[in-house]
Amino acid sequence: MATSMMTTLPQFTGLRPQLKPSPIQGLVAAQPMTRRKGKGALGVRCDFIGSSTNVIMVASTTLMLFAGRFGLAPSANRKATAGLKLETRDSGLQTGDPAGFTLADTLACGTVGHIIGVGVVLGLRTLCM
């Protein structure tokens, strides 16, 4: 019954609506799929899960989390001295991890790992251009 009804659904071209009657098919009006190319300086590519970009991002984030967890990088419980040696201190943050790796450490190391990964990906792209 709903498939034979005619209704006016607003159709947009740019910012201005164009009102024209169109048949309702189920609950969703059928729209043709069109591919649009990015207009900006950066284009988005969705590659497969084993792509080079994905491997770089996973590796850089994993290595940074590993370094933070096992005491190779400064964290909330280990501060760096002037000679870049890590010394243990009490940060006052509660954690259930035996090494004292906190949520703040996880977020910070994950962020730095992503920054390193993006730098590697963009650096390799400029070399290939």
Swiss-Prot record:
What cellular component terms from Gene Ontology apply here?
chloroplast thylakoid membrane; photosystem I
List all membrane-crossing ranges: 48-68, 104-124
Q: Which domain of life is it from?
A: Eukaryota
Q: Where in the cell is it found?
A: Plastid, Chloroplast thylakoid membrane
User: What are the GO BP annotations of this UniProt entry?
Assistant: photosynthesis
Q: What are the boundaries of the transit peptide?
A: 1-46
Alphabetized, the UniProt keywords read:
Chloroplast, Membrane, Photosynthesis, Photosystem I, Plastid, Thylakoid, Transit peptide, Transmembrane, Transmembrane helix
Pfam families, alphabetized = PSI_PSAK
Membrane topology type, per the record?
A: Multi-pass membrane protein
Q: What family classification does the UniProt entry report for this protein?
A: Belongs to the PsaG/PsaK family.
Q: What is this protein called?
A: Photosystem I reaction center subunit psaK, chloroplastic
Q: Which organism does this record belong to?
A: Medicago sativa
Taxonomy-wise, where does this protein's organism fall, top ranks first?
Eukaryota, Viridiplantae, Streptophyta, Embryophyta, Tracheophyta
In the UniProt record, the gene name given for this protein reads PSAK
